Amino acid sequence: MAFLDNPTIILAHIRQSHVTSDDTGMCEMVLIDHDVDLEKTHPPSVPGDSGSEVQGSSGETQGYIYAQSVDITSSWDFGIRRRSNTAQRLERLRKERQNQIKCKNIQWKERNSKQSAQELKSLFEKKSLKEKPPSSGKQSILSVRLEQCPLQLNNPFNEYSKFDGKGHVGTTATKKIDVYLPLHSSQDRLLPMTVVTMASARVQDLIGLICWQYTSEGREPKLNDNVSAYCLHIAEDDGEVDTDFPPLDSNEPIHKFGFSTLALVEKYSSPGLTSKESLFVRINAAHGFSLIQVDNTKVTMKEILLKALKRRKGSQKISGPQYRLEKQSEPNIGVDLESTLESQNAWEFCLVRENSSRADGVFEEDSQIDIATVQDMLSSHHYKSFKVSMIHRLRFTTDVQLGISGDKVEIDPVTNQKASTKFWIKQKPISIDCDLLCACDLAEEKSPSHAVFKLTYLSSHDYKHLYFESDAATVSEIVLKVNYILESRASTARADYFAQKQRKLNRRTSFSFQKEKKSGQQ
């Protein structure tokens, strides 16, 4: 037993003992900061002291220098000790035993007996491979199907079949489109071809899918193998191609467009459709006339009648009274609807209700068509803008941009930077559909530099009037252009407006007649 009174030596001895015996490390954690306290209690010696003092304290500080154990670190992980070499060796032996279990040792033994060359040859005997004669048995169902569908193998548009969405309805976004084919004959072009495409397909992919389905169904005539030779145009419900708008961009996705009816047109014939604009048939009716565009003279009179009725009734279903076509020069003689336009030798017809007749002089005042007038009528549907002044009742006139086309009339205010709108009401833009237009009349013409015209339209079951002023030439052109548009469209609002106007006129005439009658009796 040893008696020690030096705390530094005692602390070093305790730490060395716990390094080999304490697995928890708690004693090291408790005694780790004790050296700091000892350093405070034993300050370093001041230079200049005697050598005896240094030698006297060297024995005491020797234990203090080695008091800190090499296995104890003053850090956040002081409670975690490294594994001993024995534990690491035992772990390595355990893993080696597990690996030995997975391995299988096979002892190699050489044979003393030698095999002959004949025995070795019999082990790998060469077999004779004879070609089997072709069996003349029954054909498989796959072979029969391939022979029955030769067009499927020779379809040059097979790469676009992956965009067919008929098998993906309900699981993937698809789009159903009715496609008219103007290159068909007159009978087949009336019925569209329904195509179901993937919503992620582009317009170019849709064109290829249409060509693939067209070829797979064995339709005639055959298409060009190059998909780039075709384009998609907007089409009406009856298959008429709307050439006022350009074709769809082939690089755009098809879901970007909301049209459910399209037409497949050849690119070289798409701009050439203007050559067909000279073929127009005039259909006279009770409240005006309509110009029906036809592709050629082989069209039947039944198709012309259907187009005239649709132009007259708009988007409504063709129902109600039945109509027939008569030549303008031959009243009360119906035209055979199965005959072609070429066999009629006429370009002007009259639309008459069944079980009715027309007088010989009906529509004769408009029977003679001037070529210049027809050209003005056709160009009246093209968009053109005019700068005019809009007249208000309780405030000054405002400058507006009046845009007129065959579909609508747009009134956009012209912003003037110099004019202050702080104390005046700002003019709002107005858009009027041509089906709601009723009349356009010249109100007054004071001088060649000043004229006023009135525009009447239907708004929420009420007729509203707008007044504009400009020079006489501009006003005359606007009135003529709008009236050409109104005459070429069978508008219900326009017919009701004139009927109401006629009733008011009859009521005034009847009232004035009764007033004159009473004054005569007195």
UniProtKB/Swiss-Prot annotation:
GO MF, one term, reads: phosphatidylinositol-3,4,5-trisphosphate binding
The Phosphoserine modification is found at S128, S186, S315, S356, S510
N-acetylalanine, modified sites = A2
Q: Which UniProt keywords apply?
A: Acetylation, Cell membrane, Cytoplasm, Endoplasmic reticulum, Endosome, Golgi apparatus, Lysosome, Membrane, Mitochondrion, Mitochondrion outer membrane, Nucleus, Phosphoprotein, Stress response
Q: Where in the cell is it found?
A: Cell membrane; Endoplasmic reticulum membrane; Early endosome membrane; Late endosome membrane
User: Which GO BP terms apply?
Assistant: cellular response to insulin stimulus; negative regulation of Ras protein signal transduction; regulation of cellular response to oxidative stress; TORC2 signaling
Residue intervals of the SIN1-type PH domain? 382-487
Report the CDD domains cross-referenced here: PH_Avo1
Regulation of its activity: Phosphatidylinositol 3,4,5-trisphosphate (PI(3,4,5)P3) promotes MTOR activation by relieving MAPKAP1/SIN1-mediated inhibition of MTOR that takes place in absence of PI(3,4,5)P3.
Main site of residence? Answer: membrane
Per the record, its GO cellular-component terms are:
cytoplasm; early endosome; early endosome membrane; endoplasmic reticulum; endoplasmic reticulum membrane; Golgi apparatus; Golgi membrane; late endosome
Briefly state the modifications made to the protein after translation: Phosphorylation at Ser-128 by PKC promotes relocalization to the perinuclear region, where the mTORC2 complex specifically mediates phosphorylation of SGK1. Phosphorylated at Thr-86 by AKT1 or RPS6KB1 in the presence of growth factors; the effect of this phosphorylation is however unclear. According to two studies, phosphorylation at Thr-86 by AKT1 is part of a positive feedback loop that increases mTORC2 activation. According to another study, phosphorylation at Thr-86 and Thr-398 by RPS6KB1 promotes dissociation from the mTORC2 complex, leading to inhibit mTORC2 signaling.
Region annotation Disordered: residue ranges?
38-59
**Where is the region Interaction with MAP3K2?**
2-184
Record Pfam families: CRIM (PF16978), SIN1 (PF05422), SIN1_PH (PF16979)
Residues annotated to bind a 1,2-diacyl-sn-glycero-3-phospho-(1D-myo-inositol-3,4,5-trisphosphate):
R393, K428, K464
Binding partners and assembly: Component of the mechanistic target of rapamycin complex 2 (mTORC2), consisting in two heterotretramers composed of MTOR, MLST8, RICTOR and MAPKAP1/SIN1. The mTORC2 core complex associates with PRR5/PROTOR1 and/or PRR5L/PROTOR2. Contrary to mTORC1, mTORC2 does not bind to and is not sensitive to FKBP12-rapamycin. Interacts with MAP3K2. Interacts with ATF2. Interacts with MAPK8. Interacts with GTP-bound HRAS and KRAS; inhibiting their activity. Interacts with IFNAR2.
According to its UniProt record, which protein family does this protein belong to?
Answer: Belongs to the SIN1 family.
Q: What does this protein do?
A: Component of the mechanistic target of rapamycin complex 2 (mTORC2), which transduces signals from growth factors to pathways involved in proliferation, cytoskeletal organization, lipogenesis and anabolic output. In response to growth factors, mTORC2 phosphorylates and activates AGC protein kinase family members, including AKT (AKT1, AKT2 and AKT3), PKC (PRKCA, PRKCB and PRKCE) and SGK1. In contrast to mTORC1, mTORC2 is nutrient-insensitive.
Notes on the domains: The CRIM domain forms a ubiquitin-like fold with a characteristic acidic loop, which recognizes and binds AGC protein kinase family members substrates.
Write the protein's name: Target of rapamycin complex 2 subunit MAPKAP1
